[in-house]
Amino acid sequence: MADSKEIKRVLLGPLLDNNPIALQVLGICSALAVTTKLETALVMTIAVTLVTAFSSFFISLIRHYIPGSVRIIVQMAIIASLVIVVDQILQAYAYEISKQLSVFVGLIITNCIVMGRAEAYAMKSPPIESFMDGIGNGLGYGVILVLVGFLRELFGSGKLFGITVMESVQNGGWYQPNGLFLLAPSAFFIIGMLIWGLRTLKPAQVEKE
């Protein structure tokens, strides 16, 4: 039977205490590429969470039958299969968003968070805990993505979900959109500020020299 304390730890821990982006600095590439809009950040969060959760579940389910010499290949095959399913669903039901995300959905297979949880946790833990660990890490990744996407879209174009929130000067409003926020380097600075803020609140996360 699943340990409720362990499930709570693996589900909530990655949100703040062990965030895969803020603490482990994983999954940075997609965090830069898909956060120009809040909508794409949310969809990418859902996609990564589903792939991480179900890949961890299936890998945990067969962990005792995977030879150590080919475990990485098996893990990648399972992850790749799930990524293809997610990509096909997006193309079928959310084609415009799928086009905006471009190759980055397919590149979920190379996301260190997905592979890392499969190797570090799913290969050593029961299926239910592994599934919840996948959800927790996917949501931890998503929290940063959504925050970055929120700030970049709001200050870069004055919109959220494509809806004008702050009317631009060109349209008779007061806000002058800052195009810098729509460039990839801005995501680096925002993520850096989020990491700084989190480690200020939680000094234990600061690396010791």
UniProtKB/Swiss-Prot annotation:
Enzyme Commission number, as recorded: 7.2.1.1
Residues passing through the membrane, by range: 42-62, 72-92, 103-123, 131-151, 178-198
Reaction catalyzed: a ubiquinone + n Na(+)(in) + NADH + H(+) = a ubiquinol + n Na(+)(out) + NAD(+)
Its membrane topology: Multi-pass membrane protein
Location relative to the cell: Cell inner membrane
Recorded superkingdom: Bacteria
Broad enzyme group: translocase
GO cellular-component term (any): plasma membrane
Record InterPro entries: NqrD (IPR011292), NqrDE/RnfAE (IPR003667)
One of the protein's GO biological processes: sodium ion transport
HAMAP family reported for this sequence: NqrD
Family designation: Belongs to the NqrDE/RnfAE family.
Protein task: NQR complex catalyzes the reduction of ubiquinone-1 to ubiquinol by two successive reactions, coupled with the transport of Na(+) ions from the cytoplasm to the periplasm. NqrA to NqrE are probably involved in the second step, the conversion of ubisemiquinone to ubiquinol.
Protein name, per record: Na(+)-translocating NADH-quinone reductase subunit D
The species this protein was found in: Photorhabdus laumondii subsp. laumondii (strain DSM 15139 / CIP 105565 / TT01) (Photorhabdus luminescens subsp. laumondii)
Name of the gene this protein is made from: nqrD
